[in-house]
Amino acid sequence: MTTSFHDLLQRRAAEDGGKKAFAFVDRDERERSLTFAALYAQARQVAALLRRASAPGERVLLMFPPGLDFVPAFYGSMLAGTASVAAYPPDPRLGQAAYAGLLAIAADAGVSLILAPR
């Protein structure tokens, strides 16, 4: 029997919804966590957005700083069937070079869409 990634994530959300799926500790040593239910719900929202804005197999640049926000974006990309290309947001203190580096990554990867936190 073949089980898809979506099936596995859905099952964990149903069976272990309240359990911690991921945790992130910031530099101030504060922990933020994401349950399986929250991860699945957020990943489905991201997947729905990506399905409207791109096609399966297309490359999507996930431009997120370190933290939990990246996780549902990455899982949502997998649910949507897109290929994730992860990159840190450019540091404005570095000037144009930071943006040039990000543009080079996007061009080299052939991304069709950039997804970033609000």
Question: What annotation goes with each model-predicted range?
Answer:
Residues M1-A23, A41:
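A short N-terminal helical cap/helix-turn-helix that marks the beginning
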Residues F22-P72, D91-L103:
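Conserved AMP-binding/adenylate-forming core of the ANL superfamily
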Residues G76-S77, I105:
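Hydrophobic/aromatic ligand-binding patch that stacks against planar heteroaromatic rings
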Residues G81:
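Structured binding elements
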Residues V85-P117:
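Conserved ATP-dependent adenylate/AMP-binding module captured primarily in the ANL superfamily
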